[in-house]
Amino acid sequence: MSRIGTPLSPGATRVLLCGSGELGKEVVIELQRFGVEVIAVDRYADAPAMQVAHRSHVINMLDGAALRALIEQERPHYIVPEIEAIATATLVELESEGFTVIPSARAANLTMNREGIRRLAAEELGLPTSPYRFADSFEEYRAAAEALGFPCVVKPIMSSSGKGQSLLKGPEQLQAAWDYAQEGGRAGKGRVIVEGFIDFDYEITLLTVRHAGETTFCAPIGHRQEKGDYQESWQPQAMSTTAQAESERIARTVTEALGGRGLFGVELFVKGDQVWFSEVSPRPHDTGLVTLISQDLSEFALHARAILGLPIPAIRQFGPAASAVILVEGQSREVGFANLGQALAEPDTALRLFGKPEVAGQRRMGVALARDVSVETARQKATRAAQAVEVQL
């Protein structure tokens, strides 16, 4: 984009954000720095990104008619999906009518469920993945697990933040894992993917940004998951030059196939020099929150530049850094946080409290960030900061 207008004027450059969580909040802040007018949308009021946007709307984004009506009302220059649960077929239609979807409507459509992206990666692009089968019924699922062998992993084809995912160690876990997958799917009961288990050394997120005709990679991010949901991440993840080159080859291949411009979070399994493709998100990734302290341009700043067609001449990484999630459990519409002075007492630490309006059960409400002389000490420092925060329900 060669020109950015004045927000809230007829010549404003408008971005409509579909999904308004903590990642979207940081994207809005970065777009605001460029004087972009931002409209935040989600299925509930007072979502984090809404709190920093120019205005907001509450709709069911899986309702194609409602989504179309809102976009035709706002006439944004850029439509930026922040989550998967969107009527992506409507985005495809809108793109064909002249709207710009970031990174592309094809990317949003293929990655909204695990089947589309897995078939693209494994069957069309020939990328290495775990062996897999899809199942619509318990009988098909049981047959898939028995064919792939134990241990294996089952996931709903549509879910986020690890919801509905299980590692099956034996046939006695089949029923419980099936029930959990049916509860955790974003669209309710339905199709699952069963994957053969890869005995990997570690898993990484390779943040890959397509911008102004180029592809640039951030340093690899290592992360630890529990029940499929990220708990901590660190950068850089140590890996062999062979494994890093293969990771970049896979990431470049899949993001080129998805097309468009923007930041992608490419998830990979690594064992020695071997690399397997796992998943890709065509947007900033939760494990990439570490870049708020580890890089001169965070993943959110990179996404904003790519959206606007601005150059990214270099990405500077500041050395070992880590993030640790602040997880809250309970019921409250007035969550408070105390002991922040203690949490920030050590040098090179930071906090992000997301401002989510309520917690019901378990919810990620913030993240602690730290830099240090090594990845291990940075992880320890970030964890200390996260644990020092007192949550008041």
Swiss-Prot record:
Gene Ontology cellular-component annotations: cytosol
Enzyme Commission number(s) from the entry: 6.3.1.21
Record: residues binding Mg(2+): E267, E279
GO molecular function: ATP binding; magnesium ion binding; phosphoribosylglycinamide formyltransferase 2 activity; phosphoribosylglycinamide formyltransferase activity
Top-level taxonomic group: Bacteria
Binding site for N(1)-(5-phospho-beta-D-ribosyl)glycinamide: E22, L23, E82, D286, K356, R363, R364
Pathway(s) served: Purine metabolism; IMP biosynthesis via de novo pathway; N(2)-formyl-N(1)-(5-phospho-D-ribosyl)glycinamide from N(1)-(5-phospho-D-ribosyl)glycinamide (formate route): step 1/1
Catalytic activity: N(1)-(5-phospho-beta-D-ribosyl)glycinamide + formate + ATP = N(2)-formyl-N(1)-(5-phospho-beta-D-ribosyl)glycinamide + ADP + phosphate + H(+)
Residue span(s) of domain ATP-grasp: 119-308
Pfam families given in the database record: ATP-grasp, PurT_C, RS_preATP-grasp-like
Residues involved in ATP binding: R114, K155, S160, S161, G162, K163, G164, Q165, E195, G196, F197, I198, E203
Alphabetical keyword list: ATP-binding, Ligase, Magnesium, Metal-binding, Nucleotide-binding, Purine biosynthesis
One of the GO BP terms on file: 'de novo' IMP biosynthetic process
InterPro entries documented for this protein: ATP-grasp, ATP-grasp_carboxylate-amine, ATP_grasp_subdomain_1, PreATP-grasp_dom_sf, PurT, PurT/PurK_preATP-grasp, PurT_C
Family: Belongs to the PurK/PurT family.
Assembly description: Homodimer.
Purpose: Involved in the de novo purine biosynthesis. Catalyzes the transfer of formate to 5-phospho-ribosyl-glycinamide (GAR), producing 5-phospho-ribosyl-N-formylglycinamide (FGAR). Formate is provided by PurU via hydrolysis of 10-formyl-tetrahydrofolate.
Cited HAMAP family: PurT (MF_01643)
Protein's name according to its UniProt entry: Formate-dependent phosphoribosylglycinamide formyltransferase
Organism this protein belongs to: Azotobacter vinelandii (strain DJ / ATCC BAA-1303)
Species lineage: Bacteria, Pseudomonadati, Pseudomonadota, Gammaproteobacteria, Pseudomonadales
